[in-house]
Amino acid sequence: MTPVNVVTIAKPEPKRDSYGRYQITAPPKILQSGKPSKAKVKPRSYTRATTVAKTLEDTYKLNRWSQRMVAYGMGLREDLRDLAMGHNPDDSLQVFENIVDEASTAAETARAANKGTALHRFFEMADQGEALSTFPRHVQPHIKKYKQGMATKPFEIVHEHTEQVIALDDYKVAGTVDRFLQLTEPIQVCLQTGKVINLSQGDRIVGDIKTGRTLEWGWLSMTVQAAIYANHSATWNVDHGHPQGGTRGERVSSLRRDVALLIHVPAVEEDPQLELYWLDLEAGWDAFLTAM
């Protein structure tokens, strides 16, 4: 088997509207008789979990980083500096929008995100059984650390729900969960708040993979995002051959709502380390309700 063959079995993404929101069929209305209505239900737009999760996030440091990258990109491109000097920003809005975009591109601001997206897919392929030697050499250390690190923990990947689209119907929010993990033995988890949680064999938890250089700026949004995933009301099985773009499924069984595992493997590091962090989803859910 080669990576090319594996790529063909990647799960399709759900249909989206013009704002990038997932198109998902909501549950049928319940009639006074207590039975579900048989009326045809059209797909509706569900806000992405990542969008909601970032609502309360302090973006100051991220915005400053973006500004620094634009300044750096301008320093690399004489033509952009000339364009800026030759136009008035109040009268030439589109020109300056293009200058900012091109300066950001020159600074390779999307490089880390692209590498992270690719690494997510490589992890999925590795979990499907793809041999380490078939991956690009520069990502093999990342995949090795991921596989070795996860193998030492008392979890099994719930493969049928890898990259699973979920829906939180009451709030019209949806997202894609990287992994659901099932406990192979009982463990005790101590959160940063000091709260102790006992997990039983067979319990399932959300596993969220992050590949950014640092987690410093995103703890709140990551916890909210995982809380949305853990509290989902239904799964959405994407099928572009279906008239509605997919079919609804049941909530993932035995899933805990109080704790999730964050799996961090930085994509831009040549010798990465795998770090695991437990997330307090009760706090994340409270923050989600505030954001809504």
What are these regions (language model features)?
Residues 1-174, 190:
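Metal-dependent nuclease catalytic cores that hydrolyze phosphodiester bonds in DNA/RNA
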Residues 160-291:
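Mg2+/Mn2+-dependent nuclease catalytic core
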